[in-house]
Amino acid sequence: ELKKEAQDYLDGKDMQADAQILPTKGDKKHYPLAFNLLPQIDVLEDSGYSHEEWKMIHETKKIMLNDMNAKDIKVTATCVRVPVPIAHGESVYFTVEDESATTQDIMDAVANFPGVVLEDDIKHQIYPQPINAAGKRETFVGRIRPDYENPGAFNMWIVADNLLKGAAWNTVENAEYLVKMNLI
C-alpha cells in the first residue's frame, strides 16, 4: 500500500481515495501512509491508548522486570505509524537513580551492551536511521542527551529492524545474557 500511495502522490493522484488499510483495516475511516504520519497503530480504546501502546507498555515491563504489571518501572507510549517499509524507531525518555550520571556514562553503558550499536556523533550527524537498520539484527542507539529540566533524566533514539528484532528475538538474547551472567 505504501508503494502504491507514493506512486499515486508522485503521479498527482488523490491518495486519500485509495486508502484501505490504515490505521486499522476494520475501521470505517482510512488514511494514506505515504508522506504522512499516523499517530494510531491498532484500535484506540476509551482510555485514549491504542492496543499497540498498551502492548508496548506491558511488554517493556515484562522484559525489564518479568512482570507486566510492575510498578517499579514507569512506561508510557505513543505509537506512530511512519512511512518506512522496514524498521521501528523509538524516542525514549528515562531516568537514572544516580543524578550525577553524564551523557558519556550512558553512552559507555549502551556501547557495552551486547547486540546494541552506539551511533551517536552529533558533530558528523551520525545517528540511527531505519534505512540503515534494515536487514541487521542489532539495535541501534543514538542522540543520547540529558534532559536539562530534570537531573538524572535522559533522552535517546532507538532503531531496529522489526522483521528481525522483535519480542521473540529479544527474549532469546535476554536469556543468553542471563545464562552468560550465571543468573539462570
Positions of PLM-derived features:
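C-terminal active-site/capping subdomain that shapes the small-molecule cofactor and substrate pocket
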Residues: 69-184
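Active-site-lining helix/loop region of Rossmann-like oxidoreductase modules
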Residues: 1-108
